[in-house]
């Protein structure tokens, strides 16, 4: 082995295998492009994006880590969302959750009160 050498398996690695996924239609109703990162809690995405936010709660984009989806003004397309894993706690972002996603009260500001469609 050469120092620093990587020895990889010949089989391909499948990201997010076995994770529950849904497809949602998303439309950018705004006048500016919107980008959403790979691990952003999708339900809290920019208010100009029109989609079923209740269905997106606790989910993120099913895209490679470190990448983003870009929605141009008037752009409408389908996205695949998977469940957030780990402790399932969300803090900051748009202040809609600020705590655990599962169980307990949800003290954050509802998306509709932040101007979301």
Swiss-Prot record:
Primary gene name: ureB
EC nos: 3.5.1.5
Listed GO biological process terms: urea catabolic process
EC primary class: hydrolase
Protein localization: Cytoplasm
Entry keyword set: Cytoplasm, Hydrolase
Catalytic reaction(s) noted: urea + 2 H2O + H(+) = hydrogencarbonate + 2 NH4(+)
Gene3D superfamilies: Urease, beta subunit (2.10.150.10)
Pfam families, per the entry: Urease_beta
NCBIfam families in alphabetical order: PRK13203.1 (NF009682), urease_beta (TIGR00192)
Principal cellular location given in the protein's record: cytoplasm
HAMAP family the UniProt entry points to: Urease_beta (MF_01954)
Record keyword Lipid metabolism present: no
Protein's recorded name: Urease subunit beta
Pathway: Nitrogen metabolism; urea degradation; CO(2) and NH(3) from urea (urease route): step 1/1
Keyword ATP-binding assigned: no
Family under the similarity heading: Belongs to the urease beta subunit family.
Domain of life: Bacteria
Cross-referenced CDD domains: Urease_beta
Subunit (UniProt): Heterotrimer of UreA (gamma), UreB (beta) and UreC (alpha) subunits. Three heterotrimers associate to form the active enzyme.
Disordered: annotated segments: 95-117
GO molecular function, one term: urease activity
GO cellular component, one term: urease complex
């Amino acid at each position: 082995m050469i120092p620093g050498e990587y020895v990889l398996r010949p089989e391909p690695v499948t990201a997010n295998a076995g994770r529950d996924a849904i497809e949602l239609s998303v439309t950018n109703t705004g006048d500016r492009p919107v980008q959403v990162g790979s691990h952003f809690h999708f339900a809290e995405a920019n208010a100009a994006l029109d989609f079923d936010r209740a269905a997106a709660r606790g989910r993120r984009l099913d895209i490679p880590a470190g990448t983003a989806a870009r929605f141009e003004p008037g752009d409408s397309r389908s996205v695949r969302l998977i469940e957030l894993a780990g402790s399932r706690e969300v803090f900051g972002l748009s202040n809609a959750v600020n705590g655990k996603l599962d169980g307990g009260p949800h003290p954050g500001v509802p998306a509709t009160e932040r101007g979301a469609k």
